[in-house]
């Protein structure tokens, strides 16, 4: 470690992204690494309409949830590096990732992008793209601002809430391609399924999905 790096560590100490504990190496402390709610076995993969498989490395609870809320709403964009690493490893271990042609993400509306300043799912997609060596492109667009899915009360409401919200980018070409769709959290899968439906209708041969975390059934 250089003198400059040592000074940086003193002024801006490295902290665990989940609990905030000051650590010397990595981005996660040993305690969190051991106790995080990892998905295992059949819990990793979900079957969703229009999606060949949706994989998630973590359950959305406790420290995982709190870290995600900081990432999404408190401008902790650097968290995308650690979250993206979890997601890329999950893809490597559970999907035929070498057959994936392009990575894309669930888009934000222009209104929400202006308010937040970044699309948390696209930052994750870019990180996964870099780790897997697969190109990342904006394939979809959000045509209108709908109610946040977290504010809906049922699976039926979630399906209705995303109907007609997304469409393909004008120059996007997915004909006979396999797409990896990136989102942050999956609950019922309504948003991912609707985006996958649009991609399949545009000619995509297969759509896989990966999220940072999932809710327990």
List each model region and its residues.
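Glycine-rich phosphate/pyrophosphate-handling loop used in enzymes and phosphotransfer proteins
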Residues: 1-183, 187-217
């Amino acid at each position: 470690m250089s003198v400059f790096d040592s000074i940086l560590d003193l002024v801006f100490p490295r902290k665990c992204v989940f609990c905030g504990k000051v650590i010397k190496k990595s981005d996660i402390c040993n305690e969190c690494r051991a106790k995080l709610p990892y998905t295992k076995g059949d819990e990793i993969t979900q079957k969703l309409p229009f999606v060949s498989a949706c994989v998630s490395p973590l359950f959305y609870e406790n420290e995982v949830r709190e870290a995600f809320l900081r990432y999404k709403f408190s401008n902790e964009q650097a968290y995308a590096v650690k979250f993206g690493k979890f997601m890329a490893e999950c893809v490597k271990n559970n999907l035929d990732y070498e057959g994936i042609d392009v990575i894309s993400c669930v888009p934000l509306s222009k209104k929400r992008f202006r308010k937040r300043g970044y699309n948390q799912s696209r930052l994750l997609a870019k990180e996964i793209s870099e780790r897997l060596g697969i190109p990342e492109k904006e394939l979809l667009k959000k045509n209108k601002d709908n109610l946040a899915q977290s504010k809906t009360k049922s699976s039926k409401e979630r399906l209705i809430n995303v109907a007609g919200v997304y469409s393909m980018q004008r120059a996007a070409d997915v004909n006979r391609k396999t797409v990896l769709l990136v989102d942050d959290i999956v609950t019922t899968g309504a948003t991912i399924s609707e985006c996958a439906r649009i991609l399949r209708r545009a000619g995509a041969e297969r759509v896989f999905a990966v999220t940072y975390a999932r809710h327990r059934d």
